[in-house]
Amino acid sequence: MTTTTIRRVCVTGATGKAGRGAVRELRDSGYDVLATDVAVGADGRVSGALRADLTDYGQAVEVLRGVDAVVHLANIPAPGMATPAITFNDNVAMNFNVFHAAASLGLARVVWASSETTLGLPFGHGPEQFPGAPGELRYAPVDEDHFPWPSTSYALSKVASETIAEQISRWSQIPFVGLRISNIMEPADYERFPSYWPDPHSRKWNLWGYVDVRDVALACRLGLEADVTGSSNVIVAAADTVMNRPSRDVLAEVFPDVTLTREVGEFETLLSIDRAASLLGYQPRYSWRDHVKAEEHE
């Protein structure tokens, strides 16, 4: 099935930060969007959204019936928001249900939210790094091959779900695009970035990475439109770091024993987006540097 047949798209997790952005991006690009979330009705942030609990397979089937593709963003979005068991069980159940329902209904494409945490975050966890320890940073820039290295039940739920996506894509022949999304920021969040600069250790946990919510939405749309087969997973991050110092210098200060595998630009992200660029055509459009006054980050 070609991408030209994708007209009606279900966005799950539509009331969340990424979901709201994806709904807006897709509607602005001419897609007919069915928005759904278990939290519909809480604040009315997405009009016309349908309430559905995707831990129930029957509800997953019902919300996907009649759409051409799904952008699946509904999950417990971070570690520590629920118990480890609930985080793992609910996320894996939601992901399996949506993936299997999409395959059973013959959808053309599944784009879904994996996570940067599959790569080993939080980096530098604990007083000392040693091979195999949680948070071991093996090289930089980190790419998709710095995997799987889950250190929380949340990260483990995403690793398990990437395996589920690969298995279902194989027998269904439906392309799956997993987005290993970095720490999502809205424009209002950028005002706190200067507070990170005095202590680079404060953001070492994800190598000073972030991504604008509007670029996450872009990646969701590109995932629908890219010419791909099988199951692919790509890092989605901003083109730069949260820091006002060169990336090489910050890395050398905090992780002096970690090797750079290639030259990096002055403020270039240390979460490599090269694969997202080559596979999806992803080029981030937004940076905190466009929002924070120049004198604040000189």
Residue map of PLM features:
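Conserved beta-loop-beta element that borders a ligand/cofactor-binding pocket
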Residues: E162-P187
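N-terminal Rossmann NAD(P)H-binding glycine-rich loop of SDR-like oxidoreductase domains
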Residues: V9-S29
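C-terminal substrate-binding subdomain of Rossmann-fold SDR/epimerase-dehydratase oxidoreductases
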Residues: R214-E298
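Conserved Rossmann-fold NAD(P)-dependent oxidoreductase catalytic core, especially the SDR/UDP-sugar
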Residues: N97-S151
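Conserved glycine-rich Rossmann-like NAD(P)H-binding loop of the short-chain dehydrogenase/reductase
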Residues: Y31-A42
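NAD(P)H-binding glycine-rich loop region in Rossmannoid oxidoreductase-like domains
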Residues: A42, A52-A93, A101
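Active-site helix of classical SDR
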Residues: S153, S157-A160
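Alpha-helical substrate-binding/gating segment
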Residues: I184-H201, N206-S232
